[in-house]
């Protein structure tokens, strides 16, 4: 057997990540890949850190590489690069297949350097899957057309049958999130106070490493009565699985995890990822600039 038939690389966005959302993504990627009966052995490589000598060797030997679920594409790779590779890595970084990958944020058409790099990196025969229509259009604009919009792998099991079992009526307790890098003190204070008015128990789960510091910038009156959870995926899972627990918050993948666990969910859209998913897949998203509508969404059946 040819060495290149022996294994495939999986770019793992949870390696060296301080965002638990990346673990939610990779959990779904791993689950979906496990359904492929003839998938060879898999080897994980980071997206948040550069490759060493062994990483480059694995890239050169693998049959292909799968990039799972994260929003690491951007229009100007020389200015902003979520995917941490050096230009010299392009000698090895080839035949990558996108698996529910998205665009960093709303941007213009990719520049010439980015077009060259993406055409070099991405497999030109295999079909790529992306998170949303915006990412699809961005790739089409530079001539990469072997792409379909499947949504993020975290959403692939959110079938109509699954979603029918998600409560439509408000629960007794709520788990909420905030986003440290996309702050709006006024809107987020309104979010917290609205939750405190309508729920018996209000739990804050920090998905990112700086979310708790953002929470601590709010006044004592706003923070009073909140229960702070540990920033771990197991803590999130355990609390979302408790009966009559809703999810409301700005963290997209915490919201998708809530839907996976059949919790009533309202995602507050603060960037292109949630907003584009709502357009394409009817995800329950309320734009943050419409936060005054949250109260009605909480009390009325979803």
PLM features: residue spans?
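Active-site anion-handling motifs in enzyme catalytic cores
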Residues: 1-302
